[in-house]
Amino acid sequence: ANKRILESVWPGKVSVILPLEKSSLKKFEYLHRGTGKLAFRLPRKKALLAYLKKSGPLVAPSANPQGEKPAESIAEAKKYFGTNVDLYIAGGRLVGSPSTIIEIANDASVKLVRQGAVRVKYVTPSC
């Protein structure tokens, strides 16, 4: 079921929060900061996909600190993150809706965390 959901939203502007396996909790604690979950995204932009095919997975923060509006330019991103980010890639001004964020639980239920650019149809109402 999870594979079907992921195939329906990727590539695109949907971030998916998934629970980590117990064996990975300690190893990735610096990333999940005690939540036991990580968010993943598969972008649609061909240039970025080509880069990722060569580099492998990329660990990156959102384009904004939690609760702040998403950065629309490198200048805004640098105000948020400064030298804490190793690489900024100029992609022009980014205008539009932020990504949709969903969370898939261990029981395969899907919770809408943030409605964004993409409407998701697999959301479990009881979450």
Show the residue positions of the predicted features.
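Active-site-adjacent structural elements in enzyme catalytic cores
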Residues: A1-C127
